[in-house]
Amino acid sequence: MKGLIGKKIGMTQVFNDEGNLVPVTVIDVGTCQVVGKRTPEKDNYSAVTIGFGEIREKILNLAERGFFKKANAPYRRHLKEFRVTPEEAASFNVGDAVKADMFAKGELVDVTGITKGRGFSGVMRRWNFKGSQTKTHGTHEYQRHPGAIGQRKTPGRVYPNKKMPGHYGVDQVTTQNLTVVDVDVEKGLVLVKGAVAGHNNGVVYIRPSIKAAMRAQHKAARGA
């Protein structure tokens, strides 16, 4: 099983083994713990539930308290279920700590987070419209307006999913194929190359790269 919940600390830069300066995102995964398991006999699939971050009991509702007490697991603020094989699930017990050394230096990972909220935004910021600097295209006085949004009598309506001004941000985004630059087990930190979605102190999920695994499978199939 490979998967961690972490908190985005922020961005910095480090020197790699070749002496090049690399921008990295620092993710704190120090308090991950196994709080539940799914078995094929009971749930028809196999998975391990990871908890992250401490929380007081009085903040939890009755259902959440019952889940932790039934599993005899510590209270955790954030939960995430990771699919595993039955053999992998058997190697984990409720209460086990999951540390940063689950991922190795140089490994490719996918990091999922919630993007920063930007409120009500126009089409140039939200959809990267070029704007009308020379021609109007229906923008009237302002060149940052979206312009015409439809036709005349036919079809006589605005098509669904038309790109228009509106709320921008607070979307779940997965950044794929990020390289693990370094792992600090003592401090519970994972450093990944590049930026990940979300604001500082936001919760992120780290998984092995899906595309890297698919490429390895295709390469093995071609070699066979």
UniProtKB/Swiss-Prot annotation:
- Chain positions covered by the region annotation Disordered: 132-153
The domain of life is: Bacteria
Q: What keywords are annotated for this sequence in UniProt?
A: Ribonucleoprotein, Ribosomal protein, RNA-binding, rRNA-binding
One Pfam annotation reads Ribosomal_L3
Q: What is a single cellular component term in the Gene Ontology annotation?
A: cytosolic large ribosomal subunit
The answer, when asked if Lyase is one of the entry's keywords, is no
Under InterPro entries, the record lists: Ribosomal_uL3, Ribosomal_uL3_bac/org-type, Ribosomal_uL3_CS, Transl_B-barrel_sf
Q: Per its record, what are the GO molecular function terms?
A: rRNA binding; structural constituent of ribosome
State the Gene Ontology BP annotations: translation
Query: Among its keywords, does the record have RNA-binding?
Result: yes
Oligomeric state and interaction partners are given as: Part of the 50S ribosomal subunit. Forms a cluster with proteins L14 and L19.
Kindly give the HAMAP family that the UniProt entry links to this protein: Ribosomal_uL3_B (MF_01325_B)
Q: Function of this protein?
A: One of the primary rRNA binding proteins, it binds directly near the 3'-end of the 23S rRNA, where it nucleates assembly of the 50S subunit.
So what family is this one in?
Belongs to the universal ribosomal protein uL3 family.
Q: What is this protein called?
A: Large ribosomal subunit protein uL3
Query: What organism is listed for this UniProt entry?
Result: Myxococcus xanthus (strain DK1622)
